[in-house]
């Protein structure tokens, strides 16, 4: 690869690292072109999947201010640059790796922090952002209903007491 081509590749990878909220490094040795296309299609909505030379990826990661990825840059490496939901991408990669043993999850980073293979799998075990938001909204709605009932109880009790006093005064007169 000519020096200008390498510089261009490093610049492109650096931009991808900077624009992504997370990245997952994988080893794709032994996967067919069709299988790689299936993998790309499964994560297309939330990530870009690109094959990268290890030395160029290491330089680009350092240029982007990311440390700790060099330990995962050995063998044939492809990187999923996540621009959408990292949980969805981690799940898709984990599920694809279960079905295709030749795909190996190496590690990656999220929000600037390095992740190992176990970290990627933990990320994949999380529920999606939408599910977590729905659970949070449900908890908030329940809490608000309880708070409203709590504030209404003294008011309704006071109204019933006043009505009872009026009834008692009406009977006494």
Swiss-Prot record:
GO terms for cellular component: large ribosomal subunit. GO terms for biological process: translation. The keyword Nucleotidyltransferase does not apply. Coiled coil: none annotated. Disulfide bonds: none annotated. InterPro entries: Ribosomal_uL10, Ribosomal_uL10-like_sf, Ribosomal_uL10_bac, Ribosomal_uL10_bac_type, Ribosomal_uL10_CS_bac. Pfam families: Ribosomal_L10 (PF00466). Keywords: Ribonucleoprotein, Ribosomal protein, RNA-binding, rRNA-binding. One of its GO terms (molecular function) is structural constituent of ribosome. Belongs to the universal ribosomal protein uL10 family. Part of the ribosomal stalk of the 50S ribosomal subunit. The N-terminus interacts with L11 and the large rRNA to form the base of the stalk. The C-terminus forms an elongated spine to which L12 dimers bind in a sequential fashion forming a multimeric L10(L12)X complex. Forms part of the ribosomal stalk, playing a central role in the interaction of the ribosome with GTP-bound translation factors. This is Large ribosomal subunit protein uL10. It comes from Micrococcus luteus (strain ATCC 4698 / DSM 20030 / JCM 1464 / CCM 169 / CCUG 5858 / IAM 1056 / NBRC 3333 / NCIMB 9278 / NCTC 2665 / VKM Ac-2230) (Micrococcus lysodeikticus).
């Amino acid at each position: 690869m000519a020096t200008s081509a390498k510089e261009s590749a490093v610049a492109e990878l650096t931009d991808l690292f900077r624009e992504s909220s997370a990245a997952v490094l994988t080893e794709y040795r032994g996967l067919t072109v069709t299988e790689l296309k299936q993998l790309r299609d499964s994560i297309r909505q939330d990530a870009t999947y690109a094959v990268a030379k290890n030395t160029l990826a290491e330089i680009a990661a350092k240029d982007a201010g990311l440390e700790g990825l060099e330990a995962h840059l050995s063998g044939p490496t492809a990187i999923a640059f996540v621009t959408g939901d990292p949980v969805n991408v981690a799940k898709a990669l984990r599920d694809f790796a279960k079905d295709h043993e030749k795909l190996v999850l190496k590690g990656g980073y999220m929000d600037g922090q390095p992740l190992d293979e176990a970290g990627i799998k933990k990320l994949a075990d999380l529920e999606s952002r939408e599910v977590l938001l729905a659970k949070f909204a449900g908890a908030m709605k329940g809490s608000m209903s309880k708070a409203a009932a709590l504030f209404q109880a003294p008011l309704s009790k006071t109204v019933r007491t006043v009505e009872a006093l009026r009834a008692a005064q009406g009977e006494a007169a």
